[in-house]
C-alpha cells in the first residue's frame, strides 16, 4: 500500500472535480464522452539536493492510444519528512509542465511544506488538457526547493507521492457544433448524421457571432451577418467566395498579437 492510498482514492473521486450528469451515471462507459480514470498508482520521488526538478509519470497505466486528448482534472501530492521532528526549515513543492520554457509559466500548482508537519497531502484542480501525443512524452515534473533544512549532501530528507485523476476524450471543444448536437441527442461519442438534425444545426450557425477582427479585415462580412440575423425566416447559404492571393495572405495573419510567445 502506498503512503496515502486510502486518502488519495477518496480525494480523487470524479464528482469532487466535475459535475457528473445522470446520463453519465446510467450509460455504459462506451457511450460516455469523457472516460474518467482514477489513478491509484503513484510516483515516489526523493528530494536530495537544495533544488530538484524530478520527472514524474502522472499517466502510468493509462491507455493513450484510443483518445486524442487528456484532461488533468485533479492532482493529489502527499509527502513525508524523513528527518527528526526537531528539524527546522521546509520545502516549496510545485508540479511543473516542462513543455514551457519558463518554470514560472509551466507551474500548475505550488505549495509550501514545513518540516514540522510530518505528513501532508494537498489537492489541486488543474483542469486543463493536453494532446495525447504530448502526454505520451511525460511532460510533468516535480520542482522541489529545500529551505533551511540542515541535512548533509547526499541524503534524502523528503519523500513525495503524486496521484492524479484524468479524463480522456476525443473532443475538448465545448462550444462547437459537434458538442451542441451531441448535447441535444445523448452523451455519445459516436459519429452523428447531421442531415437529420437541421433544426439544431441551423440555429447554431445563426447564433454564432462573427469576430470583430474578421469583420475589420473583410467588411463584406457585415452584410452577410445582417442577412442571417433575422428571425422567423429561412436563410440560404451565402455564396462561396473565391479567395484571391491577397485575402489568403491576410488570413494567415494572427488576429491577436498578444498570443505570440516572447520566447526565442
Swiss-Prot record:
UniProt-annotated stretches for the region Disordered: 221-264
KW Ion transport (keyword) present: no
Ranges annotated as biased composition (Basic residues): 231-240
Primary residence: host cell
Keywords: Host cell junction, Host cytoplasm, Host cytoskeleton, RNA-binding, Transport, Viral movement protein
Any GO MF annotation of the entry: RNA binding
UniProt-listed GO biological process terms: transport of virus in host, cell to cell
Keyword RNA-binding belongs to the record: yes
Subcellular location: Host cytoplasm, Host cytoskeleton; Host cell junction, Host plasmodesma
Annotated Gene Ontology cellular component terms: host cell cytoplasm; host cell plasmodesma; host cytoskeleton
Family: Belongs to the tobamovirus movement protein family.
Function text: Transports viral genome to neighboring plant cells directly through plasmosdesmata, without any budding. The movement protein allows efficient cell to cell propagation, by bypassing the host cell wall barrier. Forms a ribonucleoprotein complex with viral RNA. Binds microtubules and modulates microtubule stability. Can bind double-stranded DNA.
Name of this chain's protein: Movement protein
UniProt source species: Cucumber green mottle mosaic virus (strain watermelon W) (CGMMV)
